[in-house]
């Protein structure tokens, strides 16, 4: 069915692509990634767009003091929209291309932001956040795949990790905007903050006219000339004879030939015997990322710091520091993910996060006292103001937890889920499925965390600590290493059922040509093709004579 849809829309898709190509393109891979990963910045704007306001008096008064259940649904409504957006993304991305999907992402985001900025009641706020969420869902499913398809293999991890960096940058920018605008009395504070969300959406929308289409998608549409030109301009300043370019084109051809010779690919294919292990690995990678508890820190940090004894501006300032930590620590992570590998970072990160979750639970459990008159039923405990050391210990656990996440699971999962398939035929749909799992867990965590704080307070962190232990165990036994491996190697590793803990040192049973060997082979084939074309042209001229 999916292949039929792609064939039906192939003509219109190429016309749309021609229209998008009217403006000159920029082929610097970092510029391209910076435009596409604005979708990640929008994801970040979503995460912190509520954080600075949920404890503010004017917010509580305007929305009639929403209880833990209502506030949970308001916060989580964007994740609900993102779930549906991520599922729908492949129905646009496959037949119409990656750029149109990013344009769709920007459109929904801007419409949702406009609705939020003109909010009159809770229902309108929820509707606006759901619509923006659809856009974020499109972007979170498409942008990592688009980056992986365009990036040279040697910096694939870096380019893939830029998505998470832009997420953290968006979180920080939005929180500080909200913090500054929070000094305005009345509803203008959050109206302006939510209206400013239109800016990154507009930048993404306009930027899509200056970046090229995915060469793999173009090749699939039979546009080989355009595909080769894009690969050459990105990897070799336009030199089509460059070995890296020849290797990349060869890999694309091999993948498409394999796709032509196989049965139709759809969502059901992901759950066949060949792919089901990869599918569940990618799904659990996204599930575990949410179950670290990171978004509890992002969405409800103001609540957490109230429990630690902070209030007013001191709460917001202390809260903002973790967003700076999140952004700054992500930068070296982009480098180390290609040096250290995926597995060591994920296992080490889960272990550290477990320790800090248990540490935070222990401090709050030991030193907090009941706080029945807090004015917020989600915050019913508090460390006394005279116990500064306990407060600082709780805050330190939060900061160290955020740093541990940013350096490991924050960057690592988006890179890993784009690589793990080892087969471009299923990568887009697989990424859409795994990303939808991320969003449904995001929704559940944002929805039920206030209720968890209300009913079990500090014990909530014990639950997330246990999840961190479980994910470290799962990564060790179930997540193979993908660092430095070509798509064919990753696919072969799955087919040979290599144990995850042996994947780092694994060598292909069926030898795969080295880059140098493949380059020599491609050069020979390229010369043979040129000679055949010359012979064909000579015969044609002789016949005409």
UniProtKB/Swiss-Prot annotation:
The chain crosses the membrane at residues 29-49, 72-92, 100-120, 125-145, 157-177, 192-212, 291-311, 317-337, 345-365, 395-415, 433-453, 460-480. One of its GO terms (biological process) is filamentous growth of a population of unicellular organisms in response to heat. InterPro entries: MFS_dom, MFS_sugar_transport-like, MFS_Sugar_Transporters, MFS_trans_sf, Sugar/inositol_transpt, Sugar_transporter_CS. GO terms for cellular component: extracellular vesicle; membrane; plasma membrane. Disruption phenotype: Reduces the binding of human FH and C4Bp as well as of human immunodeficiency virus (HIV) gp160 protein onto C.albicans cell surface. Reduces ability to form hyphae. GO terms for molecular function: carbohydrate:proton symporter activity; D-glucose transmembrane transporter activity. Residues 524-545 are annotated as: Disordered. It is found in: Cell membrane. Keywords: Cell membrane, Glycoprotein, Membrane, Transmembrane, Transmembrane helix, Transport. It is a multi-pass membrane protein. Induction: Expressed in presence of 2 percent glucose. Expression is induced by progesterone and drugs such as cycloheximide, benomyl and chloramphenicol. Pfam families: Sugar_tr. The keyword Membrane applies. Glycans are attached at residues 376, 387, 455. Belongs to the major facilitator superfamily. Sugar transporter (TC 2.A.1.1) family. High-affinity glucose transporter. Acts as a multifunctional complement-evasion molecule that causes down-regulation of complement activation by acquisition of human complement factors FH and C4BP. Also functions as a human immunodeficiency virus (HIV) receptor via binding the viral gp160 protein. Modulates hyphae formation. Interacts with the human complement factors FH and C4BP. Also binds human immunodeficiency virus (HIV) protein gp160. This is High-affinity glucose transporter 1. The lineage of its organism: Eukaryota, Fungi, Dikarya, Ascomycota, Saccharomycotina.
């Amino acid at each position: 069915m999916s292949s039929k849809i792609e064939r039906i829309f192939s003509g219109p898709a190429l016309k749309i692509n021609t229209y998008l190509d009217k403006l000159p393109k920029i082929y610097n891979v970092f510029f391209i990634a910076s435009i596409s990963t604005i979708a990640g910045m929008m994801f970040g704007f979503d995460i912190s767009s509520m954080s600075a306001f949920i404890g503010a008096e004017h917010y509580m008064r305007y929305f009639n003091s929403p209880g833990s259940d209502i506030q949970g649904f308001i916060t989580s409504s964007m994740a609900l929209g993102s779930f549906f957006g991520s599922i729908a993304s492949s129905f646009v991305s496959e037949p119409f291309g990656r750029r149109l999907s990013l344009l769709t992402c920007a459109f929904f985001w801007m419409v949702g932001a406009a609705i939020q900025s003109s909010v009159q009641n809770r229902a309108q706020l929820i509707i606006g956040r759901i619509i923006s969420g659809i856009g974020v869902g499109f972007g979170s499913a498409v942008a990592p795949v688009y980056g992986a398809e365009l990036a040279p293999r040697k910096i694939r991890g870096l380019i893939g990790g830029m998505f998470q960096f832009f997420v953290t940058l968006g979180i920080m920018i939005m929180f500080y905007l909200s913090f500054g605008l929070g000094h305005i009395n009345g509803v203008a504070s959050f109206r302006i903050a939510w209206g400013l969300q239109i800016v990154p959406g507009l930048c993404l929308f306009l930027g899509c006219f200056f970046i090229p289409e995915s060469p793999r998608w173009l090749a699939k549409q039979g546009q080989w000339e355009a595909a080769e030109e894009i690969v050459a301009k990105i990897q070799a300043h336009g030199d089509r004879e460059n070995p890296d370019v020849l290797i990349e084109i060869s890999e694309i051809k091999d993948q498409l030939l394999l796709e032509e010779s196989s049965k139709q690919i759809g969502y059901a294919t992901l759950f066949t015997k060949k792919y089901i292990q990869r599918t569940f690995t990618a799904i659990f990678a996204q599930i575990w990322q949410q179950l670290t508890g990171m978004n509890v820190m992002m969405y409800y940090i103001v609540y957490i710091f109230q429990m630690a004894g902070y209030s007013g501006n001191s709460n917001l300032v202390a809260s903002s520091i973790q967003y700076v930590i999140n952004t700054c620590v992500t930068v070296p992570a982009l480098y180390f993910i290609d040096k250290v590998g995926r597995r060591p970072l994920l296992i080490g990160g889960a272990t550290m996060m477990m320790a800090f979750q248990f540490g935070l639970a222990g401090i709050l459990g030991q030193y907090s006292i009941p706080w029945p008159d807090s004015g917020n039923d989600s915050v019913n405990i508090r460390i006394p103001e005279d116990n500064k050391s306990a407060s600082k210990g709780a805050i330190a656990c939060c900061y160290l937890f955020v740093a541990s996440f940013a350096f490991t699971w924050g960057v690592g999962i988006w890179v890993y889920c784009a690589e793990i398939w080892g087969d471009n035929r299923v990568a887009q749909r697989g990424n859409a499925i795994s990303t939808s799992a991320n969003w449904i867990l995001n929704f559940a965590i944002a929805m039920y965390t206030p209720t968890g704080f209300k009913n079990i307070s500090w014990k909530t962190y014990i639950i997330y600590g246990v999840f961190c232990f479980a994910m470290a165990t799962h990564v060790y036994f179930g997540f193979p290493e993908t660092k430095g491996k070509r798509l064919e190697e990753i696919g072969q590793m799955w087919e040979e059922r290599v144990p995850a803990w042996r994947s780092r040192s694994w060598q292909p049973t069926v030898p795969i040509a080295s880059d140098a060997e493949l380059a020599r082979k491609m050069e020979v084939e390229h010369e043979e093709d040129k000679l055949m074309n010359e012979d064909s042209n000579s015969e044609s001229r002789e016949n005409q004579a």
